[in-house]
Structures are given as C-alpha cells and as structure tokens.
Amino acid sequence: MDKLTDLNYTLNVITLLNSTLHTILEDPGMAYFPYIASVLTVLFTLHKASIPTMKIALRTSKCSYKVIKYCIVTIFNTLLKLAGYKEQITTKDEIEKQMDRVVKEMRRHLEMIDKLTTREIEQVELLKRIYDKLMIRATDEIDMTKEINQKNVKTLEEWENGKNPYESKEVTAAM
C-alpha cells in the first residue's frame, strides 16, 4: 500500500510539474524554459532517488556518516557533470586509495628495475669471463694434435703385440 501511495504521490508531482511548465510555456517571454525544465527534472529525480536510498543505507549501514558523505559527494559530482565540468569532488578515502595504488605501482617498478640491473650486472660479469677465456696467450710451440684429432692415435710400434686392431679377423660361431 505504501508503494501505491508513493506512486500516486509521484504521479501527482509530475502532473503538477507538467501543468506548471505548460503555464510557463504559454508566456511568450520565457526564453529559458529548457534550462528550467532540465533543472526541475534533475531536482525531482534526485529527490525521489536519494531519499529512499538514504533511508535504506542508514538502516543497513554501521557508519551513517560515511554513507551520508558518499551520497552528498555523488550528488555534487552528478550536478557538476550536468553543468559540464570535468572535475569531480573526491573524498579523503578515495585520495588515500589512489595514493596507495600509486605507491604500489612505484614499488613494482622499483623491483623490476632492481631485477633488470641485477641481470645486467650478471651479463657483464659473464661477458668479462668469456673475454678473459678468449684472450690470446703467447706460446712458443702450438700443439696441433688437438686440432687434427690425433692425440690418441697409436703408431704401428705402439700397438699391442704388433697387431693391427683394425684388420678383420676370422670368427667361428657354433650352430
């Protein structure tokens, strides 16, 4: 029944607004009609939307001050947007949240920079070791046996019993 009464009240207010606006329209000197109509519509919408919302929020919320502050900031931001401003009103909580987000992002960037510098230092050390190993050393005699893979090659005199291990042998197998 309460909702029906509220609906009737809303319809009566809309009818009153329409009749008022029609009487204003008949006056030919009224040049600001669209602006007045927009302001009245916004005020009526805010009135109808904010009062039930505030009642519910105050009943369910533990901290009514924060709810009221949030609702007022939202209403002012809406009015600023309707007026064409791009700036918004922010509360201290929102500013602290943004500052925390910025600080967290800066910490993440610092950690990334630290990791990158550590990797670069390791790469420089690795390049130094590679350079040290590649340095040309002066020697009197160059051992070419490593280059032609003859370090483990035996001559005929070094073979066991003087036999060539690569010659084929006769193998007998039992059937």
Curated annotation (Swiss-Prot):
Offer a single GO CC term for the protein: host cell rough endoplasmic reticulum membrane
**Chain segments annotated as transmembrane:** 29-51
User: What's an example GO BP annotation here?
Assistant: monoatomic ion transmembrane transport
Q: What is known of its domains?
A: Binds 1 calcium ion per tetramer.
Specify which residues bind Ca(2+) according to the UniProt entry for this protein.
E120, Q123
Q: Describe its assembly.
A: Homotetramer. Interacts with the immature particle in the viroplasm. Interacts with host CAV1, early and late in infection. Interacts with host integrin ITGA1/ITGB1 heterodimer. Interacts with host integrin ITGA2/ITGB1 heterodimer. Interaction with microtubules blocks trafficking to the Golgi apparatus.
What ranges are annotated Lumenal (topological domains)? 1-28
Q: What is this protein called?
A: Non-structural glycoprotein 4
Organism encoding this protein: Rotavirus A (isolate RVA/Equine/United Kingdom/H2/1976/G3P4[12]) (RV-A)
Transmembrane as UniProt keyword? yes
**How does the record describe the protein's post-translational processing?**
The N-glycosyl content is primarily Man(9)GlcNAc, with a small amount of Man(8)GlcNAc.
What does this protein do, in the record's words? Plays an essential role in the virus replication cycle by acting as a viroporin. Creates a pore in the host endoplasmic reticulum and as a consequence releases Ca(2+) in the cytoplasm of infected cell. In turn, high levels of cytoplasmic calcium trigger membrane trafficking and transport of viral ER-associated proteins to viroplasms, sites of viral genome replication and immature particle assembly. The secreted form acts as an enterotoxin that causes phospholipase C-dependent elevation of the intracellular calcium concentration in host intestinal mucosa cells. Increased concentration of intracellular calcium disrupts the cytoskeleton and the tight junctions, raising the paracellular permeability. Potentiates chloride ion secretion through a calcium ion-dependent signaling pathway, inducing age-dependent diarrhea.
The source's domain of life comes to Viruses
Q: How does it sit in the membrane?
A: Single-pass type III membrane protein
The answer to keyword ATP-binding applying to this record is no
Glycosylation, residue list? N8, N18
According to the UniProt topology, which residue ranges lie Cytoplasmic?
52-175
